[in-house]
Amino acid sequence: MSQYGWDECLYVTRDQVSTVRDGLLNTLEDNLVGVYLHGSLTFGCFNPRRSDIDLLAVTAQSLSLNEKRQLAELLLTYSVPFYPPSVTRPIEISLLHMEQLCPWQSPTPFDFHYSEQHRERYTVELANGEWQHWNDSTSTDPDLAAHITIILTNGICLYGESIDNVFPGVPQADYVASLLSDARGALHYLAANPVYSVLSLCRVAAFMTDGLICSKDSGAIWALD
C-alpha cells in the first residue's frame, strides 16, 4: 500500500498519532478543547515514506510557559526528521486558544507551533533557557486559514469537541490569501524541491479555477485532467 488515509493507515502511524494525542491530553488536561487531524491522512493520500502528520489542537486558555516547554519536549521525542527516512513520521502541529479563533482574525494568531524545521531551535532554547521568553510575544500564521478550512471540509476529531462546535467559518478571501502565500513559498523552493512545489501549485490552481478544496495529489490529478 503506497498511500492511504486514517482508516487504513499502518499501526505504526496510528500509534504515533495516538501517542502525541495522549501526550497533549496529559500535558494540558482540562485546558485541552480538542485535537484535530488534517492533511494527507484525511485526504487518503498519506505516503509513509514522504508525508508528514498534520495536527491542530485547540485550548480553552492560552498556554503557560511550562506547558509550552512540555509540548516542545513531547514533540522533539515523538516527531522525527524527514531524513533519514523512518516508519515514524515528522509532525507539524499548531496550538491555538479559543480567543484566537473567535472572533476570526487573519492572519491568525497562535500559541505554539512545531515542525521539524524548528527542531534545532527548540533543542537549543530548551538547553540555554531561552524557552522562558516564549510568551513574550504572539505570532501569526497565514497558513492557518487554509489548515482550518481543510479541517472544516474533511478533518478528523481525535479528541474533544466536534469540529463544527470549535472552528468558525473562514472567509474565502482569507483562504485565498493563505493559498497565495503557499504558492509564493512553492515558487521560492521550486529548484530545491520541485515535486512538492509543483503539487502545491496544482492545489492552488484547482481552487482558484474550480473552487476545489483538495490535497496536493488531487490537485495534480485535476491539473492532468
Kindly label every feature range from the protein language model.
Residues M1-Y36, N66-K68:
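Helical scaffold of the NTase/Pol beta-like nucleotidyltransferase catalytic core
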Residues S2-E8, E73-Y189:
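Conserved NTP/Mg2+-binding pocket subregion across the NTase superfamily
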Residues G5-V12, T59, L63, Y189-N193, ...:
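Conserved aromatic-histidine-acidic binding/catalytic patches
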Residues E29-N31, R49, P84-R89:
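Short helix-terminating capping/connector loops at secondary-structure junctions
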Residues G39, F43-T77, P90-H97:
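Catalytic metal-binding acidic patch
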Residues Q172-D225:
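Extended, basic/helix-rich recognition subdomains
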